[in-house]
């Protein structure tokens, strides 16, 4: 069976209905096989950057992982901005790039370039992808595509890049002898244990009982684990004011009485006043970007104890000396734990009144006289 046909079959197996790309000599076999399979529709865009942007927008709107198809040379380099965007915003996706015949990319690597625009594109994007690999053995092509698909959503999501030279795409292989990726081969996440997470949740509940001015800061990581449907319950049950991050703006109704917009450089003044005057800041699924918190972490919510929930331990270590609670966990697991077995909650009416005054005095849109 032809390798490019295996790729088309894989896309159908994963129920990927739409992918994005531009055809070129380097990826013609993949385009042809997908078209002949007839399951996945290829949306042809005008630029490879647009293909990678569309790949991530598809996930943002549909919640389904898809792919971008790039050709070799400038076709691959054009896609990099879209890949960096997906990397920064933790959006999963697979970039499948074509390349010159493997003879011209595998051998004589000390040469600046052999072949026609043949070069090591995975090396170029290795720092902005969760996984990047050039396939030089046709029997491993399906394995690498499967691995990229699973890794893209494993732990903190992100893009993966698989480069398949044209002679590998067109190679005929015995499907039974092809390597298959096993879910059991995924690396362990090494997040907090269930016992540790339970203890952290208990600590946060106690902190909420003690707090006079608590605040939830709700990030895009909540959506990435499919937990946005829990937010109405979270806010309403604890009766705690909330802010959202840029990418999470539509997770909660902007007109919710306890949602005070966004904070940061490009946030609303109301949201910034709420943030700076809280005494307990619970951040869930946000990487605490500089554009939101500023350059000086010690100036953020100066009188507040800060709790951060993030699946990426490196993000927690970034400002670990400022955080009182660093919780390395899935946002959904944390929120579900916080909502479980709850009884009475505090009365934060005075704090809510203060927040409402901020909203009144610093409106998102000035009233028309």
Give residue ranges: language-model regions.
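N-terminal alpha/beta PP-like core and its mobile active-site loop of ThDP/TPP-dependent enzymes
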Residues: 1-346, 357-368
């Amino acid at each position: 069976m032809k390798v490019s046909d295996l790729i088309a079959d894989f896309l159908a197996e994963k129920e990927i209905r739409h992918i994005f790309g531009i055809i070129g000599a380097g990826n013609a076999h993949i385009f042809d096989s997908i078209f002949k399979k007839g399951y996945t529709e290829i949306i042809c865009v005008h630029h490879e950057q647009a293909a990678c942007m569309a790949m991530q927008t598809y996930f943002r709107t549909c919640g389904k992982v898809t792919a971008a198809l790039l050709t070799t040379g400038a076709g691959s380099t054009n896609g990099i901005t879209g890949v960096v965007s997906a990397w920064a915003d933790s959006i999963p996706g697979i970039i499948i790039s074509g390349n010159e015949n493997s003879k011209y990319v595998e051998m004589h690597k000390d040469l600046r370039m052999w072949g026609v625009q043949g070069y090591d594109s995975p090396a170029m994007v290795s720092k902005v992808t969760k996984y990047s690999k050039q396939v030089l053995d046709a029997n491993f092509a399906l394995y690498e595509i499967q691995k990229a698909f699973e890794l893209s959503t494993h732990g903190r999501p992100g893009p993966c890049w698989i480069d398949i030279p044209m002679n590998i795409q067109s190679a005929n292989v015995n499907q039974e002898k092809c390597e298959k990726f096993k879910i059991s081969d995924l690396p362990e996440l090494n997040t907090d244990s269930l016992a540790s997470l339970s203890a952290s949740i208990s600590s946060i509940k106690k902190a909420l009982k003690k707090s006079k001015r608590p605040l939830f800061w709700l990030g895009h990581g909540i959506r990435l684990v499919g937990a946005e449907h829990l937010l109405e319950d979270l806010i309403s049950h604890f009766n705690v004011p909330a802010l959202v991050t840029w990418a999470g703006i539509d997770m909660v109704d902007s007109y919710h009485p306890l949602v005070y917009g966004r904070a940061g450089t490009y946030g609303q003044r109301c949201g910034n006043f709420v943030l700076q005057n809280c005494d307990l800041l619970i951040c869930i699924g946000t990487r605490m970007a500089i554009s939101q918190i500023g350059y000086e972490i010690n100036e953020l919510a100066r009188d507040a104890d800060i709790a951060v929930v993030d699946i990426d331990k490196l993000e927690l270590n970034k400002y670990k000396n400022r955080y009182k609670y660093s919780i390395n966990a899935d946002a959904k697991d944390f929120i579900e734990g916080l909502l479980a077995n709850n009884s009475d909650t505090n009365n934060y009416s005075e704090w809510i009144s203060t927040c409402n005054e901020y909203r009144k005095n610093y409106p998102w849109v000035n009233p028309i006289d």
